Amino acid sequence: MLSLRQTLATAALLLASLPALAASNSPVGTWKTIDDDTGQAKAIVQITEHDGVLEGKILQVLKSDDGPHPICKKCDGARHNQPIEGMTFVWGLTRDGDEWDGGRILDPKSGKVYKASMQLVDGGQKLKVRGYIGFSLLGRTQVWLRTEMPEPASMPAASSAPMSPQAGDAMQH
């Protein structure tokens, strides 16, 4: 028979493991984006959830042809010429079974906004992110890797310009 101390210790371990289990069933967290052409890491991004809707922000650009702190030269509206680091580039995704769909994703390099879907794979350690026009068959997929949050000293200050998801909705393709 288990003692009270053993029972409490077991319960504490189970409770402590719940956040890790929840994280593996949700895209919420920090991800390293991988370029689907080169296979190289491009950025560290943070996916958050507000009222069942996912949003993604670029925390740190790791590789850019435009220097260490690139701006979105080809973006329209409020994002035009704004720093890419700190920018909301994914918005509006809601859960549909085992994937998140119905949102938009911005390609900061081209300035184009695409429809988006996401699906966790490999026990929640990888995230398949698909950007597409019209039907999901007409698009590209990247696989992102779950990672740790970068140190605050290595991250740039977020832009003070408003970057509401609605600004990108006008750019539907």
Regions found by a protein language model. Name each.
Residues 99-143:
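Surface-exposed interaction patches
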Residues 17-19:
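N-terminal signal peptide c-region/cleavage motif recognized by signal peptidases
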Residues 1-11:
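Bacterial N-terminal signal peptides that target proteins for export
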Residues 23-31:
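Cleaved targeting-peptide boundary
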Residues 143-151:
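Short beta-strand-to-coil "C-cap" segments at the C-terminal boundary of structured domains/repeats
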Residues 152-173:
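Compositionally biased, proline/threonine/alanine/serine-rich low-complexity intrinsically disordered stretches
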Residues 33-116, 173:
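Central antiparallel beta-sheet cores of small beta-barrel/beta-sandwich binding domains
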